[in-house]
Curated annotation (Swiss-Prot):
This is Core-capsid bridging protein. Associates loosely with the viral DNA to form an outer shell around the nucleoprotein-DNA complex and links it with the capsid by binding the endosome lysis protein. Dissociates from the viral genome during entry. Might be involved in nuclear capsid assembly of the viral particles through its association with NPM1/nucleophosmin. Induction: Expressed in the late phase of the viral replicative cycle. Pfam families: Adeno_PV. Its main location: virion. Residues 311-321 have a biased composition (Basic residues). Monomer. Homodimer. Exists in equilibrium between monomers and dimers in solution. Interacts with the histone-like nucleoprotein; this interactions bridge the virus core to the capsid. Interacts with core protein X; this interactions bridge the virus core to the capsid. Interacts with the endosome lysis protein VI; this interactions bridge the virus core to the capsid. Interacts with the peripentonal hexons. Interacts with host NPM1; this interaction might play a role in virus assembly. It is found in: Virion; Host nucleus, Host nucleolus. One of its GO terms (biological process) is viral release from host cell. InterPro entries: Adeno_V.
C-alpha cells in the first residue's frame, strides 16, 4: 500500500472532506396541463436485416465491400519517413491555395526501408505486374574430368524457338588445375636493355614540356586489322548418357580448344630530336605598378617579438644642453598617386618602441 493511500485514510478520520451541495438559484417552472398518452410497445424486438434475408428476396447487392481499416503506425519498428520524390512546400505566413488537392498520409509517408522493400517485392510492392524471372535448374553438376576445374558457371543456351519449361543445353569452361610455368617463364625472360639503346639505364632525364620549342613529330602508326579466326578444336569426346531422373538423362560432350602461348614483350626504341635549351623566362614589371605602396597604421603592423635585452655597460651620461632645440626642416615630397591617402601620425604613435617590452598574448 502506497504512502499516499495511507495519508488519505488518516485524513478521512481527522478531517473528512465533506462538501455541502452547491447552492443554485431556483427557477420557477411553468405548469401545463397535458393529456397523458399511453404508448403500446410491441414485445417483438426490431432486428437488423441480415445479408442472407436480403438475398432471399432477390435483391442485388452492388459494391458490398468492407471498409478500409486505418493504418496502424503504433507498434511498428520502422520510422515514418517521406517517400522518395515527395515534395512538401511550406511558406510561413502564407495560406496554401491548393486546399482541394490534399494528399493522404500513406501517399506522403512511408517506411524507413521503403527501397529495400521494393527490391525484395514486399509490403505494398507485393502486388501488381512484375517481370518474370526464368528459373533454371541445373540437372547435373558432376565433373567427369577431375584434373580440370570449372572457370565459369553453367550458362544455359536458350533458343528463341524453344518451348517453355523445356530442357536446354548448357556450356561451361574448364581449365587445368596445375600449369607448368617453366616454358612460359623462359619465354618471358627478355633483356629489356637492348644494344641499340643510346641512354644507359638509370640516367635518363625527362625534360619539361615547356622546354621543348620544336613541334612534336607525328610518326606514322601502322594499324593492322585482323579478321576473326575460326576456333580450332583439337579433340571432341562424347561421353555416355548419365541418367538423372526417370526418363531424363544428361550427355556431356568435351571440346578441347588450344590456348595460344604467351608471347614475350618486344621493346621498340626510336630516336627523337629534343632541344635541351631552356625556355625564356617571362620578365614582369615591378610589383609597385600593380600593388601600390601604402602606409599602414601601427595597430595594423603588429608588435615586435620579445627579445631578451643584452647586458649594457654603464656609460657616463651627457649633461643636458641648455640650448634651445630647433627641429630640422623636413623635406616635403609631392603626394604619391596611390589609392590610400598619405597620413601623418602623432609622435606618440611610433612603430619602434623605445625599450623592449614583454607582451603576453
Amino acid at each position: 500500500m502506497s504512502s499516499r493511500k495511507i495519508k488519505e485514510e488518516m485524513l478521512e478520520i481527522i478531517a473528512p472532506e465533506l462538501y455541502a451541495p452547491r447552492h443554485r438559484r431556483s427557477v420557477k417552472a411553468e405548469t401545463k396541463s397535458r393529456v397523458k398518452k399511453e404508448e403500446i410497445k410491441s414485445k417483438r424486438k426490431w432486428k437488423r436485416p441480415q445479408i442472407d434475408d436480403l438475398l432471399t428476396e432477390d435483391v442485388e447487392v452492388v459494391g458490398a465491400t468492407a471498409p478500409r481499416r486505418p493504418y496502424q503506425w503504433r507498434g511498428r519498428k520502422v520510422k515514418r519517413v517521406l517517400r522518395p520524390g515527395t515534395v512538401i512546400t511550406f511558406t510561413p505566413g502564407v495560406r496554401s491555395r491548393e486546399r482541394a488537392s490534399k494528399r493522404s498520409s500513406d501517399e506522403i509517408f512511408a517506411d524507413e526501408d521503403i527501397l529495400e522493400q521494393y527490391e525484395r517485392g514486399e509490403g505494398e510492392f507485393r502486388y501488381g505486374k512484375r517481370s518474370k524471372a526464368e528459373a533454371a535448374v541445373v540437372l547435373d553438376t558432376s565433373n567427369p574430368t577431375p584434373s580440370l576445374h570449372p572457370v565459369t558457371p553453367q550458362m544455359p543456351i536458350v533458343h528463341t524457338s524453344a518451348a517453355k519449361r523445356s530442357a536446354v543445353p548448357t556450356v561451361e569452361v574448364l581449365a587445368p588445375k596445375k600449369r607448368r610455368f617453366t616454358e612460359s617463364s623462359d619465354q618471358l625472360a627478355v633483356d629489356m636493355v637492348t644494344e641499340t639503346s643510346t641512354v644507359p639505364p638509370g640516367t635518363a632525364v625527362l625534360l619539361p614540356a615547356r622546354a621543348v620549342k620544336q613541334a612534336r613529330r607525328r610518326f606514322p602508326v601502322a594499324v593492322e586489322s585482323k579478321k576473326p579466326e575460326h576456333m580450332v578444336v583439337e579433340e571432341v569426346k562424347v561421353r555416355d548418357v548419365k541418367p538423372v531422373a526417370p526418363g531424363i538423362g544428361v550427355q556431356t560432350i568435351d571440346f578441347k580448344v588450344p590456348v595460344d602461348a604467351p608471347k614475350p614483350p618486344v621493346s621498340i626504341t626510336e630516336q627523337m630530336d629534343i632541344s635541351s635549351t631552356p625556355a625564356k623566362k617571362v620578365a614582369y614589371g615591378p610589383a609597385n605598378k600593380i600593388i601600390p605602396v601604402a602606409w599602414q597604421h601601427p595597430s595594423q603592423m603588429g608588435f615586435p617579438k620579445y627579445v631578451r635585452p643584452k647586458r649594457r655597460r654603464r656609460v657616463a651620461r651627457r649633461s643636458k644642453s641648455t640650448g634651445r632645440f630647433v627641429a630640422a626642416p623636413r623635406k616635403r615630397t609631392p603626394r604619391r598617386k596611390i589609392v590610400l591617402p598619405a597620413v601623418r601620425y602623432h609622435p606618440s604613435l611610433d612603430t619602434v618602441p623605445r625599450s623592449q617590452v614583454a607582451i603576453w598574448r
